[in-house]
Amino acid sequence: MKVVALISGGKDSCYNMMQCVAAGHRITALANLRPKENTDELDSYMYQTVGHQAIDLYAEAMDLPLYRRTIEGASLDTGREYSQRDGDEVEDLYHLLKLVKEKEGVEAVSVGAILSDYQRVRVENVCTRLHLQPLAYLWRRDQEVLLGEMISCDLHALVIKVAAFGLDPEKHLGKSLGEMESYLKQLSQKYGVNVCGEGGEYETLTLDCPLFKKKIVIDSMETVIHSADAFAPVGYLRFSKMHLEEKTNSSALPLDSCPCLQSIDKMTEEQVYADEADAQGESTSQPDLKCHADGELLASCSARTTLGYRWLCGISGPQCDEPDIQNQTRQAFALLQGEVQKMGLELKHIVLVHLYVQSMADFSALNSVYQSYFGSNPPARVCVEAPLPKGQLLQMDCLLHDWVGTAPDDTPRHKHAMHVQSLSHWAPANIGPYSQAIKVDEAVFCAGQIALVPCTMQLLQGGALRQACLSFAHTESVLQAASSGLTLGHALQAHCYVTRRRDVPVVRRVWQRKLEELRAEEESFGEEEAQCGPLVVVVVPHLPRGAAVELHVIASHDDPRERSSSRVTTQAPSGAIECQVLLSGTRQCATVSLSLTLLPSAPATAGEEGLLQALRGAFGGRPAPSRPLPLPAVRQDLLQTRQRPGRTARGRADTVFEGHS
């Protein structure tokens, strides 16, 4: 893609440009926001302005057109989310990039954010409005590794501002990254200083890198003390004279060091087993799930839990002989809005959607309608193909949440969406209108993750083993970003969807190995065993992008040692029903997992009916249906069975067909 690079003059924006080129993109223009005249340091939440005197030389060194705009706005909207607001400094960025797009025809924007959600959210907001793709290849990279890469890739940058305990303007201004690397690591270990300066501890100016055709030379400068604080003085360099010099030798840009592919190779190499079923390397459909065409499922709603959760299941458009996916999606949302309004809620209260489609070929057309019903932070979503009744193209089961009363111990309520749209090496950007995760207090509801290579958004080839390793790693990356310290070991419930029955043991072994690795790392848990939710494996016909594996997790940021669980198995003539309840350590979240296992000797239809009969008997004795139910309908039917007057369920009852026979 043709890329405009947002530059501050610092190391991060420069190294992200190098990553863009390594990924096959072409930098065609530079863009910079500068302070008003006679101003060096601007009180901005978004932009680095120290060293702005060098930006013109920076562009000349790269032989690229430079677009600059003076920052007129201020930091007005400083919340987690951003909405267009006149007078905000973010709107200066919008107008700058709008001009560059009109003049240069760029398709993407390079941004050097490493850890700042504040900056990422605002750049993504602007890019969405301008239909540009943000490229943030440094996003959530390990900072020590990243700093080492910058130095080893011949990025020469000087420290031009310091503002942290342990950094002294008189000692450290003007030093190179190579000279500072060891000391910055020491500060990180002692005081928690961000090695790459993501907390504003220091700022840099790049004088040379492999993308430069000439290098910048500083002739004269002065030190300005902004604050003479005894513990954390703030000072910066002001440059009065600089020039460019021809480079006698140029270092080559490393093009074979993609962190995504390196980590993928490492993950699969560490898998000590091989699965013959995975050797074919391609996923195939699993057509043995059947559904009769008669009957229509009605929307149903669970009782509200004490913490404000409720399920709304069976949302779909009316069945018809010649259905259209977009019309049926609109009709489904009309029904959804009506049901939600009856509760006194809005669509913004939805935190998780289970979306079932009759054909994955409708994925793009459905998304084009789906996205119009949600704002900038849509709910997390899990999308799979399922055998729906004839004429029904989709079904949605939605988990809603609204605050009820006060939190336990008067703790504040928190709800936060992780909706990353930038291409990076971290985890896949969204391929649809959903958030990677929604966090409500201690609970984290993750979207389904498939094995897309983050920097290319292409599906990883090689079969279920490799895809399971990568999709599980993506899920853990999302968990850690949503809530620091969260791992797969904090899962209360995990669903893994596969498209081949033979891949069930493959994903189970990957899951088990991952948990064993976590237990080995977390010896601080002591002798008490940490309890992780069960992995329920479901065989479905198809997954988005033709993936072989999709993982969905609900997690809780509690102490897994303090969880409690119980398990009950009920035998039936045609198979078995296993119910597992897991209660979080804080007693605020709980999940109920039900898996139905058919005996190999049981006829499919009769066995299914027999298990459902036994299931209903266990949960209230409703008669069995006259027809077998499709996979998503089981959740709805069980939901209707559970609603008894005067009882409130905690957590959710989630019923799936396990991929075993």
Predicted regions and their residues:
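Short, structured patches in soluble enzyme cores that scaffold and shape functional sites
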Residues: 138-139, 159-162, 208-211, 398-400, ...
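ATP/NTP-dependent adenylation/nucleotidyl-transfer catalytic domains that generate, transfer
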Residues: 1-2, 26, 38-41, 55-60, ...
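Glycine- and other small-residue-rich loops at beta-strand/loop junctions that grip anionic moieties
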Residues: 111-112, 135-139, 196, 386, ...
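Short, surface-exposed amphipathic charged segments that create phosphate/polyanion-binding patches used
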Residues: 84, 146-156, 172-178, 394-400, ...
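Short, polar/acidic, helix-capping and beta-turn segments at strand->helix junctions
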Residues: 267-661
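ATP-dependent adenylation/nucleotidyltransferase module used to activate substrates
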Residues: 1-159
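Short, catalytically relevant binding-site loops at active-site mouths
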Residues: 115-118, 140-144, 165-166, 426, ...
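Short glycine-/acidic-enriched loop or helix-start segments at secondary-structure transitions
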Residues: 15-16, 78, 119-122, 169-170, ...
